[in-house]
């Protein structure tokens, strides 16, 4: 089956390289291979008012002649260049991150301070055990509070 009609094709490169071009769009559907090919052919002035034949026998069961207006679509102007354009790779910008301020402003002085309490922990346990024993003065005060 061959279906021919006009269709708008979005071909955009840049605004400066565009011109209006009248294009005839042909679509060829191959039922056996289930493939679709689309071609664009530049229209001549004699073809502008030509009716378009659409074969729709596979869908409706008959052929129709339909008059389709010509569409003006932007197409890029092809410029010949001696050498291909070389596009430099885009370098990624580093993300802005907050710098973490160090917790230890003077690591040498604090490291010595941290080692001293670790060594004095056994001494502190002994001190706590001695504090836990009530003295004679504390026992008299605690007895008075409990009796009254």
Swiss-Prot record:
Residues 83-148 are annotated as: Disordered. Residues 92-103, 113-124 have a biased composition (Basic residues). It comes from the Bacteria. This is Uncharacterized protein MG219.
